[in-house]
């Protein structure tokens, strides 16, 4: 049966408002949107919950520039800027030893740019090493699916090489030569304490 409007105009069905049929794309379940920081934060939360280690991510320092006080009892920050962090991302205690490390990730597949680090971070890590702390860097090559644990004493020569006019990056093969690869799992997600046990205890 044909449906029409008064005056003889034909009715045509409109699909507006109906859900459109989308082409299904395959779902991948591996590391969906997880960053290195997310993985490490989940890992250290697991360590803490299971009394394995006490490691925390340091908050990023913020400089507050302008504050508004709409009421006497409340304040509203109107303008603030991230300060350059003066030390590393993570620190804590494991098996009675002080642990301090910086974590970086890259989308590169052939090398890691040293511009991701700052002089003051290198100075801080060198000072921790002098005090016999466990200090290292964790570098994730996201596209390769590789995460590397590098003791600071093995990483620092690459920084010195750059400072004296050499390469401004570290090749993946150089990193593989001096690092311990961190396995990716469920709980803990990135068990970097395995590397500490292997290299320091």
UniProtKB/Swiss-Prot annotation:
Q: Which residues make up the annotated site Transition state stabilizer?
A: 104
UniProt superkingdom: Bacteria
User: Molecular function (GO) terms listed?
Assistant: endonuclease activity; magnesium ion binding; nucleic acid binding
Task: Write down the SUPFAM superfamilies for this protein, in alphabetical order.
Answer: Restriction endonuclease-like (SSF52980)
Could you tell me what the cofactor note in this record states? Binds 1 Mg(2+) ion per subunit.
EC number(s) from the headed UniProt entry: 3.1.21.10
Keywords in UniProt for this one?
Cytoplasm, DNA damage, DNA recombination, DNA repair, Endonuclease, Hydrolase, Magnesium, Metal-binding, Nuclease
Q: Which Gene3D superfamilies match?
A: 3.40.1350.10
GO biological processes = chromosome segregation; DNA recombination; DNA repair
One GO CC term, this protein: cytoplasm
Give the matching Pfam families: RecU
* Cofactor(s) this protein requires: Mg(2+)
Q: Which reaction does it catalyse?
A: Endonucleolytic cleavage at a junction such as a reciprocal single-stranded crossover between two homologous DNA duplexes (Holliday junction)
Cite the binding residues for Mg(2+): 87, 89, 102, 121
The compartments listed are: Cytoplasm
- Give the family this protein belongs to, as stated in its UniProt record: Belongs to the RecU family.
What is the documented function of this protein? Endonuclease that resolves Holliday junction intermediates in genetic recombination. Cleaves mobile four-strand junctions by introducing symmetrical nicks in paired strands. Promotes annealing of linear ssDNA with homologous dsDNA. Required for DNA repair, homologous recombination and chromosome segregation.
This one is known as Holliday junction resolvase RecU
Q: What gene makes this protein?
A: recU
